[in-house]
Amino acid sequence: MYKIMWLLKRKPGTTHDHFRHHYETSHSVLGQKYFGHLIQSYQRNYNTAREQDGGGARASDYDCVTIWEMPDAELVDEIYRIMADPVIGPIFLEDESHFLDSSETRLVRCDTRDTGPGDGAEWFRHLASAR
């Protein structure tokens, strides 16, 4: 499985609600229209933490982490080819100007490995030996 993670910030002056609404009703719809056939999953994960959570971790400055999942990296090249189209590319750029601070967008390419959830047996052995 191959993943692309987009770290996204809203445009200055844009509320969280407007950012989310525009992304869900316009930008993600464009993504589905033009390259939805190439991806297995298109997730938008909105930041709900606005201040430091427990454990000392600082809240992220990003408003959304978008994740595309696909079987292999070659499909990313096809998406980039579509986005470079002289008709399609400007459609996305114009739409982004309504809600996204593109200068702050970050891209993370991931070659994903999943160990699964586990069965918890090791934790229970640890608890039993602590008694």
Predicted feature residues:
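Macromolecular interaction modules
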Residues: 1-131
